[in-house]
Amino acid sequence: MKGLVIYKGKYGATKQYAMWIGQELRLPVASADRFPVDELPKYDYFILGSSVYIGKLEIRNWLKKNFDLLQNKKILFFQVSASPPEQIEKRESYNKASLPSSILRKIQFYYLPGRMIMRNLSAWDRFMLRMGARLSKDPGEKKAMLTDFDHVKKENILPVIRAIRILKEVNEPETELA
């Protein structure tokens, strides 16, 4: 089976995960913005990665535009967000706000923790975070919105790696030697 990792992110965490996944599985890795879509039919499965920006998946427009080329392929999707992976309902709401149900039901999702380093954000993004923090009534949430964190670790990709290895075992059974 021939696979490809495609990602779209804003500040580097999604790209880092994509590179680690590609390295671990020996797969090519490409930015959604730079990959020639006419090459998509050559692949049997895809690992898509996207960061979340203002409650929406960064890769949403690319995925909607190109889904016809992907829909008969196996798709695993890793979402990278500031929201903790255990906040499944919140993480799922980002998917639902970004993609139609016809796409959602054909994708296997994985939620990976992200990073936020205030000094690396654009002036606009820092402003938006400060405004969001001011509007928050929860003091803990307010503080968290303005505090640097980096939860991007290589071991976070293990569930994605396991899923692909299982997929490949199922679709490429070992042949017995005569």
Describe these PLM feature segments.
Residues 1-71, 162-178:
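N-terminal beta1-alpha1-beta2 submodule of the flavodoxin-like/Rossmannoid cofactor-binding fold
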Residues 45, 55-178:
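FMN-binding flavodoxin-like domain, especially the glycine-rich phosphate-binding loop
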